[in-house]
A protein has these predicted regions:
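Intrinsically disordered, charged low-complexity linkers and terminal tails
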Residues: 3-7, 30, 55-58, 62
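Short, charge-rich, low-complexity alpha-helical interaction segments
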Residues: 11-35, 111
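Amphipathic protein-protein interaction modules
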Residues: 43-92
């Protein structure tokens, strides 16, 4: 699937999987592990370079492609739809939960994580 077709699916609110998202990113971008933070003030989660790489790639991809917060969350597939929405009081997938609360305002990268191939 092409990058343009994938982005059109996301923008049309069609269901995509985490695996599809990571595959599209890997096919179209070079990844550089980087530290990123997600959240604000006492709810800020700092992710060291090389940790939570799926989240790092997805947030960087969504930012580059100017996706809305809801479109960005859809990129996490079942981690968002089942694990987080299905367990609203849970503590798993904290990067997703923080993004739901703080959106793009809470996302900060130490450096650029993705570069187009």
């Amino acid at each position: 699937m092409s990058l343009a077709h994938f982005l059109q699916q996301v923008k049309n609110n069609e269901t995509v999987s985490f695996e599809q998202t990571i595959k599209i990113i890997s096919e179209n971008y070079s990844y550089q592990p980087t530290e990123f933070s997600n959240g604000l003030a006492e709810n800020k989660l700092t992710n060291a370079a090389g940790s939570n790489e799926g989240s790092c790639k997805i947030f960087a991809f969504a930012k580059i492609n100017q996706l809305s917060p809801q479109q960005t969350l859809s990129l996490f597939g079942d981690f968002y739809r089942k694990d987080v929405l299905g367990d609203p009081a849970g503590t798993g997938h904290q990067n997703i939960r923080n993004f739901m609360q703080f959106g793009w305002e809470g996302i900060h990268f130490a450096q650029q994580a993705l570069a187009a191939k």
